[in-house]
Amino acid sequence: MSRQELRAERRRQAREESAYVAKLKRRGMSRRQIAAEMRHYRSGHRRAIEEARRRAEAARQAAIARQRAIDEGLRNEVQSNIAKDEKTGEDPEVRRAAVDALGTHAGTVVVMDPKTGRVYTVVNQDWGLRRGFKPCSTIKLVTGVAGISEKVIAPVETVSDGGRYRIDLTDALAYSNNTYFQQVSGQVGFDKMMQYAHEMGLGERTGINYPNESSGRIPLFKSGFALNRMGSHGDDFEVTAIQLATLVSAISNGGKLLVPHLPRTVQENSSFKTEVRRKANIESDVWKRMLPGMIGAVNYGSGRK
């Protein structure tokens, strides 16, 4: 039991004891009889509490064991996927660094030049290209762009963080503030949120020269708090790592959605040219306003190691 649960249990026990004593008094029992009865009563309560604690701890340990088994299965899957990656044309030094950075974590790594779309490595290609995942807080990039574009986020406006303080866009991105982006998403609205998600390449293939790329998925409809949460947690989105790489690249390069490409031969390498899928129909100042918060996340915020 947690401390809070234990305090609640003690309060409940005190109420029950008080009611039980009153019941014994109504029976006309003497103080000595009541004291003896209460010792027996409390002994039973202690056994019940210990049993509840034992069961709660057993359930907690079982949950930990299940999660460890899931994590171990995912790590094994990742290592198996990495062994099957197509490495032709990849930069071996970049790949080695990416594999080392991933370590024993269950994940994928995409290394891509945000100005040219040149891909240097994709570690765990099955997850990075062919399997969409809930984007979690990375969806805040879409919410931020939508909020600025729709004038929901003013140039110098701050928003309450749900407590005593107010926070601006830069710190909201840097610290991944859920309350801020939930408010923005709710004010932007579902249709506009989907418009900007499409504009930034979600829900469609990037065109990378690997087979069986996934297009991911975008939500069908959200309203109320579900809409707010979608803009902070990415509920019902499925996004691939390569989609996220092209989205982040578009923010940094001024709105160009590039076609990622890995040159696999000497000829492809020498003739490589940047291919722009499209230019996002978003004002250039919007991208510039996003960058300080993204940099802040790494330098001092939630992305800092």
Feature-to-residue mapping (PLM):
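Extended, non-catalytic scaffold segments that flank or surround catalytic motifs
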Residues: 74, 135, 155-157
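Short acidic, glycine/proline-rich loop/turn micro-motifs
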Residues: 81, 123-126
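Beta-lactam-recognizing serine transpeptidase/beta-lactamase-like catalytic domain environment
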Residues: 85, 106-121, 131, 150-305
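A short, polar/charged loop-to-alpha-helix boundary motif
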Residues: 129-141
